[in-house]
Amino acid sequence: MKPRHASNSPFSLPVLQMLAFIAIALSTPVPAVEKTGFNSESPLRRVEYWQLRSEAINAELENRAALPAVKLVFLGDSITDFWQLGENPWVRGQQFGIDSWKLAFVEGLPENRALNMGISGDRTEHVLYRIQPKAAGGLGQLDAPELDPEFIVLMIGINNTWAQEDPVVESVFAGIVSVLNAVHARKPKARIILQSLLPTNDEVRNGDVVVPVNARIKDLAARQPHAAYTVFLDLYPLFTDSTGKQKTAFFVTDGVHPNAAGYRAWSATLLPFLRSERNP
C-alpha cells in the first residue's frame, strides 16, 4: 500500500467546498429591489430659510395682543437674525446668540422686550420691501398700529457689499438712507438706533467699503433732519483688535457673523446705550 501524502492546504475538503460555495454566492448578482415613492416624482414647493423666517415674523405680527409689550424692534439681515439662534444650523459646533438674546430681550427688563425682524440674506432693498405698506405692495411688517416700539434697532447694508452696485460706497449708503427714511415714515414716534456695519474678515472690503460707509452714516445721524430721531451706535471698534483687524474671537468661521461671545459683547454694549438714551 502506498503511503498517503499529506495535503499542503491548511483547509480540509469540507471547508474548501464551503468557501467555494460562498464565493459563487457572492459573485451572483442580487436582483435590485424596486423602490417607488421618490421625492423626485412629486411636485414640491421650494422653501428657503428666508421664506420660513419671514413667515415666522408675520406670525408674531399677527398676534396683535402681544405687540404693545414690544419696546424694541430689531431690523436687519442675518447678523440680527442669528442673534436668536442657538447652534449654527449649517456648521455644527458653532454657537450664535440665543442665550444673550433671551437674557436681555426676552427674560430681561420689560422696557427691553424685543421683536427680532432680521432675515438672513436681506439687503437694503429687501428690508424696504418688507416694511413697505401692504397697501403699496409690500409685506407691511410695520403696518400694525399695535406695534409701537420705543426704539428701532437697525443694522443693514453688509450684504449690499457683495454683488454690489458701483460705486459701492455710494450705493450701500444710499440704501441705508432709504431704509432709515422708510422706517421713520412707518413709525415716526420711535427713536432709531442706527448701528454701524461690523468688520468682516476681508480687510480690503473693510477698508474700501465698511469703514467709509460707517463714517457716512455716523455723519448722517448727527445732521438734521435725521438727528431728531436717529442716534448712531458705533460697534466697529468693539469687534476689532488693537491693530484694527476683525476680532476673530467674536466671529464664527465665516468671518461675517458674530458667535456667542460676539453677541454677548454686543448686548453688553447695547443695553447701557439704551439706558443712556432713556436717561440722557
Question: Which role does the model predict for each range below?
Answer:
Residues 114-119, 123, 157-172, 200-206:
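Surface-exposed cleft-lining segments at the edges of enzyme active sites
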Residues 153-161, 180-213, 236-242:
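Active-site segments of SGNH/GDSL-like serine hydrolases
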Residues 32-120, 125-147:
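Serine-esterase "nucleophile elbow" of acetyl-processing enzymes
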Residues 71-76, 113-118, 150-156, 160, ...:
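Structural recognition of the beta-strand scaffold that forms the well-ordered cores
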Residues 14-25:
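Bacterial N-terminal signal peptides
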Residues 199-280:
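Catalytic His-Asp segment of secreted/periplasmic serine-dependent ester chemistry enzymes
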Residues 168-178, 209-214:
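Charged helix-capping and loop-helix junction motifs
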